[in-house]
Amino acid sequence: TDGTIDFFNLDVGGNWGPVSYIQHGMYPEGHWAQMCGEAKQATTLPVLYVGRVVHAETAERIIADDQADMVGLVRALIADPRWLTLNLAGEPERVRPCVALNDCIHRYTLEGLGFGCGTNPRAGRESKPPIGTASQPVRLLVVGGGPAGMELAATAAERGHEVELWEAKPEFGGR
């Protein structure tokens, strides 16, 4: 090697949706890691696996199984910028998960809208002041305890609304 290439970024997308190079939620975490590992055997340069990785255990497994030297976590960090801090603190259950809606890609790239995230309403708005207290608090029922429903309920409660959150399943969190 002459130093022109520092590492390989190996990514496999899907044919569902207009942004085909980004793995969507229909693929399980680390779905293409084995293929990345096979490619890694052909080089001495570091290899970065980029795909759907939500949990620290998945990233650790990919590296431990020698399928990659590094794991990209861009969408996980957009969904929750505290991802690394919470995982290092032993509190992975507090991480707001990326559910691979790919709003972060579609909104900006295809629809010409501002950058955003389906589970983190603050993504792309970090420099704006927080939303203030509601001038007229209301009673609000949020149906669905997935990440978006929980975020809506939390944001509404922070603004002073009286919130009830209903979920059909015994636990919150969605998929």
Language model segments and positions:
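Flavin-dependent oxidoreductase catalytic cores
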Residues: 1-143, 147-163, 171-173
